[in-house]
Amino acid sequence: MARILRGEIRWADLNPVKGREQGGKRPVVIISQDVFNERSGTVIAMAITSQPQRAGFPLTLELSSSILPKQSWVKISQVRTLSVERIGDVLNRVAPEQMERLIEGINEIVGG
């Protein structure tokens, strides 16, 4: 498999799930550092949804309409560690400013 890089938006298989976890085959944004992705056999990612979100930042971040075919939101609270075997093709990547906002959001949620 090609290198998985921080900031990439890739397809991922999030099944099986429990409770309110995001599931199915859907886009995710990779938030873990490249060296972690390369050495661990896993990545840390946030789920993306095309369903309009009522919750704003820091729980969700709306992506620019040009990034994916449908208007989409990153669900910052839906952070998952995934085996690289669950990760598929690259769809696009988020801008560095968007990555900063995602990390800022998770820090607000966990108290960083």
PLM feature spans:
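Conserved functional hotspots at enzyme active or ligand-binding sites that engage polyanionic ligands
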Residues: M1-G112
